[in-house]
UniProtKB/Swiss-Prot annotation:
Name the record gives this protein: Probable RuBisCO transcriptional regulator
Subcellular location: Plastid, Chloroplast
Originating organism: Porphyra purpurea
InterPro entries: LysR_subst-bd, Tscrpt_reg_HTH_LysR, WH-like_DNA-bd_sf, WH_DNA-bd_sf
DNA-binding region: 23-42
Length: 317
């Protein structure tokens, strides 16, 4: 059998250089010396008889041949990792790694608790959590970098035929006010009252912001007329701003369970308006599904109930 003109280590090095943008940073990330990295790439180029990087640039830039090898090499490495994980599974959850993805709010407030439950039952399984935008997490699932993910938005159009999307649970979005706000003394507030508030909001491209705008529009409320005091990219920063009396905000109920319990923000009900979004589980049906993934789905995810139902996971355990 003819020997391959490259090794897995060389593919890992190529991938690291492309990711880090330089030989030095790639060497640091792989805990090897820069000369060792350079020598491996020189040997690889000689074996393939092609140049993999543009010479003369400060940044390590792949040639067309380098990009081609990176694309196929990434698939080879992913398949090797999949094979190792399948073999680990033969030990019946006595090892291996579970990689879970989540969009921002879900990853911050829901997943740590569910992962904690899983780790109590299967302490030998290492669990990694990746939290990014819905778009980035969807691509990570599609590429096999994440086993499954829970997202609060829609899968990108180009991945809808690739990923399996399953409705999971409803997540209610609450209008929160500072405890000192006059509206906190009222019952339900009227739709017109929303135009009198000053809002702390996520940026217009965020999934939650889009859901809020859509649902409010369906109820005849024009969110473009809202007075936006400031836009922040962190739910924690938004909650702190509300607690400090800077304005009102819409956030997931799962993000304010502690604040409601301590009574430091007010959940204002809007008359005849409830804002909800659907959380979804996404997987790539064409990728290997580990026992850890199946177990997490069947034993842990089924325990979830929405905070707006005033229940806890403990009620079901």
């Amino acid at each position: 059998m003819t020997d391959l003109p490259f090794t897995l280590d060389q593919l890992r090095i190529l991938k690291a250089i492309a990711k880090e943008g330089s030989f030095k940073k790639a060497a640091n990330s792989l805990y090897v010396s820069q000369p060792a990295i350079s020598l491996q790439i020189q040997n690889l180029e000689r074996q393939l008889n092609v140049a993999l990087f543009e010479r003369g640039n400060k940044k390590a830039t792949l040639t067309e041949a380098g990009s081609l090898l990176l694309r196929y090499g990434g698939r080879i490495l992913a398949l090797c990792e999949e094979t190792c994980r399948a073999l680990d599974d033969l030990q019946n959850l006595q090892g291996g790694t579970l990689i879970i993805g989540a969009s921002q709010t879900t990853g911050t407030y829901l997943m740590p608790r569910l992962i904690g439950l899983f780790r109590q039952r299967y302490p030998q399984v290492a669990v990694q959590l990746q939290v990014h935008s819905t778009r980035l997490i969807s691509w990570s699932v599609a590429n096999g970098q994440v086993d499954l993910a829970i997202i609060g938005g829609e899968v990108p159009t180009e991945l809808q035929d690739v990923l399996q999307v399953t409705s999971y649970a409803e997540d209610e979005l609450a209008l929160i006010l500072p405890k000192s706000h006059p509206f906190s003394k009222l019952g339900d507030i009227q739709k017109e009252d929303l135009y009198r508030l000053r809002f702390i909001a996520l940026d217009t491209q965020s999934t939650i912001r889009k859901v809020i705008d859509k649902v409010l529009s369906q109820h005849g409320i024009d969110s473009s007329r809202f007075k936006i005091e400031m836009e922040l990219n962190s739910i924690e920063a938004i909650k702190n701003a509300v607690q400090s009396g800077l304005g009102a905000a819409f956030v997931s109920v799962s993000a304010i369970a502690k604040e409601l319990e301590l009574g430091i923000v007010h959940w204002a009900q809007i008359e005849n308006v409830t804002i909800k979004r659907m959380l979804s589980i996404i997987v790539n049906p064409n990728r290997y599904k580990s026992k850890a993934t199946e177990t997490f789905s069947q034993e842990i995810l089924t325990l979830f109930v929405t905070p707006s139902q005033h229940k806890t996971l403990g009620d079901k355990l």
